[in-house]
């Protein structure tokens, strides 16, 4: 039986650290994944209202095949400035590409945003949004251990009509292959079945990581868009006002095309955990990070291993989504 890594976090994948920065007054924040060493990245965007930066550089046809960090942030378009802060902090640490010996270090730092501008926090920042400073602060706090729930990019998030947040999980596939996921959960859809207690992702749960609740004997009522009236009243039915932002990682070096396939397969984790998902109101975006020394072979063997990794990444992402909401709504948060 496959088990999570020691931390049950994306940082069980060697070479990754995660940092949060949270502004309680504004009810927003930034979560950054730092890639230490040699990493390749890709991204897959499925939602109808995404907000992002530097995602095109990750496309398989483009020449840059390294990545230094991924930024998940609140703040909608204002939040994209968080990547400026992360980029500046990393360049100051001499992390990044150099196009000439005299060049500044140029970090490759893609970012994606979620909308939390109507969550009740103080957004009267005038000409000084907090996100660049939050980005720098997230680099300073990066570690292999980090908080889950209403923190960082998940501080002001909503999952349907309840609190969303940050979640993370991992899965050890053996033979040196570790898969992990990180998510900021802010969808228009629901992560809970109609009983209001059981997560749609329950079949994938390990060790009661999101409460261990199981559905009753009766079949669930499968409303295509649960709580439609309340979502409309809460202003959630606006394109771009919701999203789920994910990062999956594996301890094997893949090509950019293979990393893209990994990101695409991992999107299935959203469909396993949220109903509905990939809606016009969402900006669902999943990044894939690949780096490490695990050998996945060549030819048909490599394709089989990539399929296995992609399936595990989807499961990890589904678990992370449920865990994010569970932690955000626990009595201690």
Per-segment meaning from a language model:
Residues 1-77, 81-84, 92-333:
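A structural signal for small-residue-enriched, beta-sheet-centric alpha/beta enzyme cores
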Residues 89:
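Active-site catalytic microenvironments for nucleophilic, acid-base chemistry
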């Amino acid at each position: 039986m496959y088990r999570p890594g020691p931390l049950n976090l994306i940082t069980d994948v060697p070479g990754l650290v995660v940092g949060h920065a949270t502004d309680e007054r504004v009810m927003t924040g930034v979560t950054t994944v730092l890639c230490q060493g040699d990493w390749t990245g890709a991204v897959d965007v499925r939602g109808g209202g995404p907000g992002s930066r530097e995602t095109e550089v990750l496309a398989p046809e483009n020449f840059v095949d390294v990545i230094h960090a991924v930024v998940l942030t609140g703040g909608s378009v204002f939040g994209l400035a968080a990547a400026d802060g992360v980029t500046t902090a990393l360049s100051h640490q001499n992390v990044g590409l150099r196009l000439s010996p005299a060049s500044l270090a140029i970090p490759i730092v893609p970012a994606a945003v979620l909308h939390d501008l109507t969550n009740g926090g103080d957004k009267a920042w005038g000409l000084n949004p907090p996100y660049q400073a939050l980005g720098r602060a997230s680099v300073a706090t990066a570690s292999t251990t980090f908080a889950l729930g209403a923190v960082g990019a998940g501080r002001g998030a909503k999952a349907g009509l309840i609190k969303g947040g940050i979640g993370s999980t991992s899965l050890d596939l053996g033979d040196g292959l570790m898969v992990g996921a990180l998510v900021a959960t802010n969808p228009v859809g629901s992560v809970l079945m109609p009983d209001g207690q059981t997560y749609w992702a329950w079949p994938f749960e390990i060790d009661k990581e999101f409460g261990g609740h199981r559905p009753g004997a009766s079949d669930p009522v499968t409303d295509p868009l649960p709580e439609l009236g309340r979502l409309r009243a809460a202003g959630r039915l606006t394109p771009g006002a919701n999203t789920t932002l994910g990062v999956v990682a594996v301890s094997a070096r893949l090509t950019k095309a293979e990393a893209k396939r990994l990101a695409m397969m991992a999107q299935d984790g959203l469909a396993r955990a949220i109903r509905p998902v990939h809606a016009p109101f969402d900006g669902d975006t999943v990044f894939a990070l690949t780096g490490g020394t695990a050998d996945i072979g060549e030819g048909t063997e490599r394709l089989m291993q990539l399929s296995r990794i992609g399936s595990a990444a989807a499961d990890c992402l589904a678990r992370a989504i449920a865990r994010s909401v569970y932690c955000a709504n626990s009595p201690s948060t």
